[in-house]
Design a protein with these regions (language model features):
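Substrate-binding strand-loop-helix patch
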Residues: 154-155, 179-188, 208-225, 281
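Mid/C-terminal beta-alpha module of Rossmann-like enzyme folds, strongest
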Residues: 192, 199-249
Length: 288
């Protein structure tokens, strides 16, 4: 099978390329520099040239602050482009997978969010991602949307991805508090996405690892694991701060946004590993 991966230069995209090749798939991958999905008119020509059987869109404008500053670009990348690709894939008989986010919710629920829960976004990013999901499924009812959350992995720009290096260098680590959610090692996320695609399911599914956590709990678990392997850990204290004290975090995030994975596990016929196991896998990958 040939798979075309959009946003292949991003964290999840890179792992999707590796996992697809590991499964023996033929891969056509495009980074943001190689294929700008905001140019929606190139979808048809790209499909005709590459002739894939599956397209996975991992391209997204994920900076909440940038989305607020440039709403037109956010709408183009997170909403209009996925719709265009979903429509063209439907026309060409190509399966289409689009990646979503927990940030479409406001965090006011007291239990994990279900795939069918209605979006209640707090930010421009969340609004456009929610509208993007809606448009994708309207343009192509056979499309698959897989929601991810707090993704971490090698070479990632996210705080969780950078955390092991920070713990090895700083005595006091300050991070955003007051938030609980699901997290996902990018390697496991890529396995879930491809497993769901191979099952030929459609609609909305959640692709996170089992359990919920906070950034502080994640950091403390990383310290525990690193020390158990005899790795150098300089950090002596993990300190939670309110979001308004964290430089660069100007846009509200949901305070509670775990994603329920029961339906995903039913379809896959397996239990998805807890996030702690994903952290172990990640630390081993980077040699910590």
């Amino acid at each position: 099978m040939k798979v075309l991966i959009l946003g292949a230069g991003g964290l999840t995209g890179r792992y999707l390329v590796c996992e697809s090749k590991r499964r023996g798939m033929e891969v056509a991958s495009f980074t943001k520099q190689e294929l700008d999905i905001s140019k929606t008119d190139i979808a048809r020509d790209t499909l005709a040239k590459e002739r894939p059987e599956l397209v996975i869109n991992s391209a997204s404008l994920t900076s909440l602050e940038l989305c607020e500053e440039n709403p037109a670009l956010s709408r183009k990348v997170n909403c209009e482009a996925p719709e265009a690709w979903a429509k063209e894939c439907g026309r060409a008989g190509v399966r289409f997978v689009h990646l979503g986010t927990d940030y479409i919710f406001d965090g006011k629920k007291t239990s994990a969010y279900l795939p069918q829960d209605l979006p209640t976004p707090l930010s421009r990013y969340g609004k456009d991602k929610a509208e993007g999901e809606k448009r994708v499924l309207r343009a192509n009812p056979h499309a698959l949307v897989v929601r991810l959350a707090w993704v971490f992995g090698h070479g990632g720009k996210t705080f969780m991805s950078k955390l092991p290096g920070i713990l090895a260098e700083k005595r006091v680590v300050e991070l955003a508090g007051g938030r609980t959610g699901s997290c996902t090692y990018a390697g496991e996320a890529s396995r879930i996405i491809l497993d769901l695609a191979e099952k030929r399911v459609e609609g909305i599914f959640h692709g996170v690892q089992a359990g919920e956590t906070t950034w502080k709990r994640f950091a403390e678990k990383a310290i525990e694991l690193m020390k158990s392997e005899g790795r150098s850990v300089v950090c002596e204290e993990v300190r939670e701060l309110s979001q308004d004290k964290i430089p660069g975090l100007r846009v509200p995030r949901p305070a509670f946004s775990p994603l329920d994975i029961l339906e995903t596990e039913k379809i896959l016929g397996r239990k998805i590993p807890e996030w702690e196991k994903g952290l172990v896998e990640y630390l081993r990958e980077i040699g910590w």
